[in-house]
């Protein structure tokens, strides 16, 4: 996605 939710995979 490229959002700031990388730790919320």
Curated annotation (Swiss-Prot):
Q: Which UniProt keywords apply?
A: Amidation, Neuropeptide, Secreted
Top-rank lineage group of the source organism: Eukaryota
Q: In which tissues is it expressed?
A: Dorsal ganglionic sheath of fused ventral nerve cord.
Which residues get modified to Leucine amide?
9
Query: Any S-S bridges, and between which cysteines?
Result: none
Q: Which GO terms describe its cellular component?
A: extracellular region
Q: Which residues form the signal peptide?
A: none
Any single GO BP term: neuropeptide signaling pathway
Q: Where in the cell is it found?
A: Secreted
Q: Which family does it belong to?
A: Belongs to the periviscerokinin family.
Function of the protein: Mediates visceral muscle contractile activity (myotropic activity).
Indicate what this protein is called per its UniProt record.
Periviscerokinin-2
The organism encoding this protein is Sarcophaga bullata (Grey flesh fly)
């Amino acid at each position: 996605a490229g959002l700031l939710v990388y730790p919320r995979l």
